[in-house]
Swiss-Prot record:
NCBIfam families: MIP (TIGR00861)
Organism of derivation: Arabidopsis thaliana
Short sequence motif named NPA 2, residue ranges: 197-199
Record protein name field: Aquaporin TIP2-3
GO molecular function terms noted in the UniProt entry: channel activity; methylammonium transmembrane transporter activity
Function: Transports methylammonium or ammonium in yeast cells, preferentially at high medium pH. May participate in vacuolar compartmentation and detoxification of ammonium.
Induction (UniProt): By ammonium nitrate in roots. Expressed in roots with a circadian rhythm showing an increase after onset of light, a peak approximately at midday and a decline to lowest levels before offset of light.
Subunit: Interacts with cucumber mosaic virus (CMV) Protein 1a.
Sequence motif: NPA 1, positions: 83-85
UniProt xrefs under SUPFAM superfamilies: Aquaporin-like (SSF81338)
Recorded domain comment: Aquaporins contain two tandem repeats each containing three membrane-spanning domains and a pore-forming loop with the signature motif Asn-Pro-Ala (NPA).
Amino acid sequence: MVKIEVGSVGDSFSVSSLKAYLSEFIATLLFVFAGVGSAVAFAKLTSDGALDPAGLVAIAIAHAFALFVGVSIAANISGGHLNPAVTLGLAIGGNITLITGFFYWIAQCLGSIVACLLLVFVTNGKSVPTHGVSAGLGAVEGVVMEIVVTFALVYTVYATAADPKKGSLGTIAPIAIGFIVGANILAAGPFSGGSMNPARSFGPAVVSGDLSQIWIYWVGPLVGGALAGLIYGDVFIGSYEAVETREIRV
């Protein structure tokens, strides 16, 4: 059963909530800077050459490490979402209210945009790569791929961080979350790019001015995240009472 709570504006503007938004902004900025920065660095080192297997592995590792750190540094303040799909998935399970979740989205997207602007500045105008489906694939395939890989990510978040029965698993949550993102980039990178994160795709799209495929990276991840929240929250957590987002330690 969906456990969505709307919440109140007052609670969403409390001191602790404002700190959570700032935490999401900073952590997402650092994650996107390192993740997108690894792709920019690859382009620099290869003179804008095509992505090869070694480059894919390097970019996947960079994203995995950066997300591990980002989740770790934000966990005790905001829950360490760094991703609108994660926020939506947790909202489906009643772990965060819709109003507060909406401001999380804003903070995450702003963090991504600022990270990309900083990358353009510090690289002397190098372009930031955007997500897009590969040649020969259609938008539908891209959306389905993003649904699957984002489902895996948010399911992992639930299992290791949000489930009240997690026990000692909570201590390895950031590692598990980083690992699943790295693995999914290796699997989906050559096809959809393996975004799993609307904010991660939104920043480069806005800064580059290429919004032609951005809808794929909102629809796919949000559907995947919502499905994971619905299935894990309803089937496996069941009658457990929902906890507040900042009580979820990853």
